[in-house]
Amino acid sequence: MLSVAKLFFMNNKITYRNSNQNIENNNSDSCAGSEFWSMEGKNVQLTWFDVPANTNFPNHKHDSEQITYVLERELFFKSGDTAYRLAKGDCILIPGNIDHEVWTEKSSARAIDAWSPVNKVYTVNKISLLNKL
């Protein structure tokens, strides 16, 4: 089963570009070039992100709860007046409908996000992992 999931995961790599994706309140191309892979079930989603250095996902919010786990290097998050620096092995929970900003500084980062319910912004296609197994 794991090999099927891995193949499905890797075959759905797409490049994130603001002109093709709509994040609420996002009016900049600063996150262009970030890549993600996504797989989803009926009510849960997992995304794997490769984010270049000096990338900014401007202040936004979404209905989904988000858990981010940093795999490599570091990511920065800000919500309200509070900023967080997450290094490899750190994770953060962002409740749904909370304004937040995410960015990298001098180095790229790699992270996994878990979403519930599915965040439609990062939906790759209509075929769920459950249908593939």
Residue positions per predicted region:
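A short, N-terminal "cap"/entry segment at the start of jelly-roll beta-barrel domains
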Residues: 1-43, 127-133
